[in-house]
Amino acid sequence: MAETAASRTGSVSRKTNETSISVSVNLDGTGKSKISTGVGFFDHMLDQLARHSLIDMEIDAKGDLHIDDHHTVEDTGIAIGQAISKALGDRRGITRYASIDLAMDETMTKAAVDLSGRPFLVWNVAFSAPKIGTFDTELVREFFQALAQNAGITLHILNHYGANNHHIAETCFKAVARALRTATEIDPRQAGRVPSTKGTLV
């Protein structure tokens, strides 16, 4: 009888004086999402993250939006990162590394990931305006910093060029999504081994 593959899912509930957030992810999904953060542009970006990574995501976030969006965006990144880390488990059999150059109209952005267990963000992205609509562009970096730190991944994001700030932000999310899609995939040639000569990624 064939063995049933272990479920690669993770759920996190996080409550502080500033936010209340619940996140569930399925690494072996189809990119379905149910997202509500109260921040419209951020919801749109998270939908792109789920759809292009093929990671199913359910995200419900309530935060102190009467102050600003910062706590909600950062804490959502923390919770998604923790949920992904749970879903990865001991990271046996994963592809681990991936990178992609992603184009959108006039914009080109590169994302490279290593699901190493060692959190690090290299951010080389510049926006030409402080806001996209009402959304603070500096929060894009804050989100990815929180995601990388709590998922235990090394993440490099480089915007090669682009003129439209919406496109720059969106290519960051889409490029990271596509890199995660590849890096989290199970490589049958690994035969369940941890992809590291150290024997551990946690």
Swiss-Prot record:
Recorded hits in SUPFAM superfamilies, A to Z, give: Ribosomal protein S5 domain 2-like
The UniProt record lists the EC number as 4.2.1.19
Q: Work out whether the entry's keyword set contains Translocase.
A: no
Cellular component GO terms, alphabetical = cytoplasm
EC category: lyase
What PROSITE patterns does the database record attribute to this sequence?
IGP_DEHYDRATASE_1, IGP_DEHYDRATASE_2
Q: Where in the cell is it found?
A: Cytoplasm
Pfam assignment, any one: IGPD
The Gene Ontology terms for molecular function here are: imidazoleglycerol-phosphate dehydratase activity
The record's Gene Ontology biological-process terms are: L-histidine biosynthetic process
Catalytic activity annotation: D-erythro-1-(imidazol-4-yl)glycerol 3-phosphate = 3-(imidazol-4-yl)-2-oxopropyl phosphate + H2O
Q: What pathway is this protein a component of?
A: Amino-acid biosynthesis; L-histidine biosynthesis; L-histidine from 5-phospho-alpha-D-ribose 1-diphosphate: step 6/9
| UniProt keywords, alphabetically | Amino-acid biosynthesis, Cytoplasm, Histidine biosynthesis, Lyase
Classification via InterPro entries: IGPD_sf, ImidazoleglycerolP_deHydtase, ImidazoleglycerP_deHydtase_CS, Ribosomal_Su5_D2-typ_SF
The entry's family comment says:
Belongs to the imidazoleglycerol-phosphate dehydratase family.
Q: What is this protein called?
A: Imidazoleglycerol-phosphate dehydratase
Q: Which organism is it from?
A: Rhizobium etli (strain CIAT 652)
Q: What gene name does this entry carry?
A: hisB
